[in-house]
Amino acid sequence: MVSFSLLRTTRPLQRCGQLVCMAARAQHSKVAQTQAGEAAGGWTGQESLSDSDPEMWELLQREKDRQCRGLELIASENFCSRAALEALGSCLNNKYSEGYPGKRYYGGAEVVDEIELLCQRRALEAFDLDPAQWGVNVQPYSGSPANLAAYTALLQPHDRIMGLDLPDGGHLTHGYMSDVKRISATSIFFESMPYKLNPQTGLIDYDQLALTARLFRPRLIIAGTSAYARLIDYARMREVCDEVRAHLLADMAHISGLVAAKVIPSPFKYADVVTTTTHKTLRGARSGLIFYRKGVRTVDPKTGKEIPYTFEDRINFAVFPSLQGGPHNHAIAAVAVALKQACTPMFREYSLQVLRNAQAMADALLKRGYSLVSGGTDTHLVLVDLRPKGLDGARAERVLELVSITANKNTCPGDRSAITPGGLRLGAPALTSRQFREDDFRRVVDFIDEGVNIGLEVKRKTAKLQDFKSFLLKDPETSQRLANLRQQVEQFARGFPMPGFDER
């Protein structure tokens, strides 16, 4: 297995080789384009983006530069491999293929049938699932459509569901609604009741969840989070589901890469259905997956007849034709590439490093006096509660953005405002993909702390959030401090390699 340190040493040499090859290909391609254009006397579709649309090309270059010179700490983001990006930008974008392998509504689907079947096989292999007991639909466009398709398959309109409350670390699609409005489509089409964290421990309150479930009698309980740094007790949630006769759906969108690498517990032993995105810790293209149990569910004690699971047909029908049309074949191929990568020893080492880096970041924050929801982390992220510091996540996010550190404001338990929530969510996956190690994350915390201190000083001088943002740009002393910190951050960040394409 190649070590991270060796990769760090050899990557610049690899990049040089890639640039030489790219230059040769570009020269050959340009000649071919010119010849083809002259022969056809018009549009050939072979024009490069830089030639065809310089304005868009420049925007892409600016975004690539932003990613290279900045520190990406948004927990739901990662850097996709060049191999997966090549599949994503391939001729598969051209093919329409409504339906499923062997049952398409369009001709010419023999190759995309093979691609979809390969993606299904790799998805099951990545999570060590027996094809006789589990199936997977790889067509959902992303995580939210995957969840809605699963709900559509498992529930009737206005059936009851329970999910972790959004301010406590849940996700919009788990049924969130405010005091005055149903926000998520899940809460519009189904009746939702949240479960919450224990305010003293910052952990999911499983006892209260069980009590609420006995009263609410949900048809579905969702085990999944978007800003919760601890492991989920799937066994306990299975007990609750069995007691109230509810399905258990595990949404592992944030942690699926860690599950595939076997560095945290898997939900598959306990869940009926498992959904996930593919671009977070799994480090693939943006898409969604729905896993479902199949085979024998139980045996009728009176007749001895086997009773099968019925999820497969219901989920497939919910995805197509109920909610989607033609699948995105280019995305399915790119996901298949990422799933193959997820089965390698290198990916397991990456996932272990994600956990080590998140822990190092949490420890460094605690040593600097920051408060973390639940007191730490077991996963890829930490949720910082800035309220004891006297700052909010919106102000911290803006300061960090101005110094090329990308994080996101996030609600903490007890928050009443999504505009100025008390939390800041920080994730390790993206920078770990750039080969950051523990000491590098401790340095990142130094930068964050300096940014927070700037934010605290400016907050004392301003009232409203808009005044705060304006002061950051207009006050000469503050602007200079931000510029100095930004220079340090960018100089540090540029010392690490970037996955994907080298456009420049």
Curated annotation (Swiss-Prot):
Reaction(s) catalysed by this chain's protein: (6R)-5,10-methylene-5,6,7,8-tetrahydrofolate + glycine + H2O = (6S)-5,6,7,8-tetrahydrofolate + L-serine
Post-translational modifications: Succinylation at Lys-280 inhibits the hydroxymethyltransferase activity. Desuccinylation by SIRT5 restores the activity, leading to promote cell proliferation.
Gene Ontology CC annotations of this record: BRISC complex; microtubule cytoskeleton; mitochondrial inner membrane; mitochondrial matrix; mitochondrial nucleoid; mitochondrion; nucleus
Keywords carried by this UniProt record: Acetylation, Cytoplasm, Membrane, Mitochondrion, Mitochondrion inner membrane, Mitochondrion nucleoid, Nucleus, One-carbon metabolism, Phosphoprotein, Pyridoxal phosphate, Transferase, Transit peptide
Listed Pfam families: SHMT
Gene Ontology terms describing biological process: formate biosynthetic process; glycine biosynthetic process from serine; glycine metabolic process; L-serine biosynthetic process; L-serine metabolic process; one-carbon metabolic process; positive regulation of cell population proliferation; protein homotetramerization
Enzyme class, first EC level, given as a word: transferase
Modification N6-acetyllysine occurs at: K103, K181, K196, K464, K469, K474
Cystine crosslinks: none
GO molecular function: amino acid binding; chromatin binding; glycine hydroxymethyltransferase activity; identical protein binding; L-allo-threonine aldolase activity; pyridoxal phosphate binding
Residues modified to Phosphoserine: S470
Pathway(s) of this molecule: One-carbon metabolism; tetrahydrofolate interconversion
Localization per record: Mitochondrion; Mitochondrion matrix, Mitochondrion nucleoid; Mitochondrion inner membrane; Cytoplasm
PANTHER family membership: SERINE HYDROXYMETHYLTRANSFERASE, SERINE HYDROXYMETHYLTRANSFERASE, MITOCHONDRIAL
Misc. remarks from the entry: In eukaryotes there are two forms of the enzymes: a cytosolic one and a mitochondrial one.
Task of the protein: Catalyzes the cleavage of serine to glycine accompanied with the production of 5,10-methylenetetrahydrofolate, an essential intermediate for purine biosynthesis. Serine provides the major source of folate one-carbon in cells by catalyzing the transfer of one carbon from serine to tetrahydrofolate. Contributes to the de novo mitochondrial thymidylate biosynthesis pathway via its role in glycine and tetrahydrofolate metabolism: thymidylate biosynthesis is required to prevent uracil accumulation in mtDNA.
Record's subunit section: Homotetramer; in the presence of bound pyridoxal 5'-phosphate. Homodimer; in the absence of bound pyridoxal 5'-phosphate. Pyridoxal 5'-phosphate binding mediates an important conformation change that is required for tetramerization. Interacts with ABRAXAS2; the interaction is direct. Identified in a complex with ABRAXAS2 and the other subunits of the BRISC complex, at least composed of the ABRAXAS2, BRCC3/BRCC36, BABAM2 and BABAM1/NBA1. Identified in a complex with ABRAXAS2 and IFNAR1. Interacts with KIRREL3.
Name of this chain's protein: Serine hydroxymethyltransferase, mitochondrial
Lineage, uppermost ranks: Eukaryota, Metazoa, Chordata, Craniata, Vertebrata
